[in-house]
Regions:
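Predominant activation on well-ordered alpha-helical scaffold segments within soluble catalytic domains
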Residues: 56, 99, 152, 196, ...
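Short, low-complexity disordered leader/linker segments with a strong preference
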Residues: 1-41, 319
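Pocket-lining segment of extracytoplasmic ligand-binding domains
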Residues: 96, 126, 164-168, 172-259
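Short, glycine-/small- and polar/acidic-enriched structural segments
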Residues: 36-163, 167-170, 179, 186-192, ...
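Soluble non-cytosolic domains of exported or imported proteins
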Residues: 49, 77, 92, 141-146, ...
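Secondary-structure end/capping motifs
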Residues: 227-303
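Conserved C-terminal helix/tail region of periplasmic/extracytoplasmic solute-binding proteins
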Residues: 297-319
Length: 319
């Protein structure tokens, strides 16, 4: 059974951090440069997470040739709700969320793989040094998400069985971090920039075992938007590739402001932030769906007959 936190005194300690992290979320949208009005705008939902960084940089540097609007959200629930209602045309999401939406009848496609970054942070208990030390401990997570999936996959015995632990439901990542600092949690998987923030606060942060959470996010679109707003989709992908090339060829000091604006973190943290190895646009490898989908079926989140058929369409011709 997933435990609920007994109190919320950690919330006060999180307030300052939350204000910092949401500072860049207050504006409702940013518009990429280009032929405004030439085509219906492609509206993307974005969040303060490193997998959105190439899109944010492309928007700021005018790498989009067509109208691409970025609408900021502060939580995955808000983002996914906007996608479900058609308020946005697309957003980066994890494979699990995309498959869950498609299994419920959402006309969704996932044409582009993206790169995120997650690590596990320990609390202040100095006896906890390895993943195997977390047997029976209190682990913060959000149920039925890739975080719960990754937690179960990471905490395994030498024989491959999931180690028993006490899951504590903490959906908001800033609160999860503050509960680690206050001793209410023994460990939790955190996305960037929160893992780096945990390290700057003196918490021990470790990488997850290879393959568990390396290939789990992609850029999803409503199928209708992907098919009818093709010029803007092509512009988005070209701009995405230009942004990655720019990041690879330019010292981080020259674009650290984009990290600060997107993630709401101080420049000194942005400079040491562990960023993923960004790749130019490519389709998701559907073999990475299999372990996630198997886990989802075990949890009865999708029907046993569901196979994610048609979820990954071909990328458009960029010529």
């Amino acid at each position: 059974m997933v435990q609920q936190p007994k109190h919320r005194k950690a919330l006060l300690g999180t307030l300052a951090l939350g204000l910092v992290l949401t500072a860049g979320i207050l504006s409702s949208c940013l518009t990429g440069g280009g032929k405004a009005g030439a085509q219906p705008a492609l509206i993307l939902g974005i969040m303060p997470s490193v997998d959105y960084l190439p899109i944010a940089i492309a928007s700021e540097h005018g790498f989009f040739d067509d109208s691409v609007e970025l609408v900021r959200f502060s939580s995955p629930m808000e983002r996914d709700a906007a996608l479900q209602t058609g308020s946005v045309d697309g957003s980066i999401t994890d494979y699990m969320s995309a498959m869950l939406l498609q299994s419920k009848g959402q006309e969704l496609v996932l044409p582009l793989a993206t790169q995120g970054s997650f690590r596990l942070a320990f609390g202040h208990n100095e006896d906890l040094m390895r993943l195997s030390d977390l047997e029976g401990k209190h682990i913060g997570l959000s149920s039925h998400t890739v975080i719960e999936y990754a937690t179960e996959k990471a905490l395994v015995s030498p024989k491959g069985k999931t180690l028993p632990f006490t899951p504590v439901e903490v959906q908001k990542v800033p609160i999860r971090l503050e509960m680690l600092r206050s001793g209410e949690l023994d460990a939790a998987i955190l996305p960037e920039p929160f893992a780096t923030l945990a390290a700057t606060k003196g918490l021990r942060v470790v990488s997850l075992p290879d393959g568990i959470i390396e290939h789990i996010t992609g850029l999803a679109f409503l199928r209708k938007s992907y098919e009818t707003k093709r010029p803007a989709v092509v512009s988005l992908i070209k701009g995405y590739n230009k942004a990655i090339a720019y990041m690879q060829e330019t010292p981080r000091e020259e674009w650290v402001g984009s990290i600060v604006q997107l993630l709401g973190i101080p420049p000194e943290v942005a400079l040491q932030l562990q960023l993923p190895d960004y790749h130019p646009a490519a389709s998701p490898d559907t073999t990475h769906f299999a372990p996630i989908l198997e886990w989802m079926k075990t949890k009865k989140l999708v029907p046993q007959s569901y196979q994610a058929t048609g979820l990954v369409p071909p990328l458009p011709d960029l010529q």
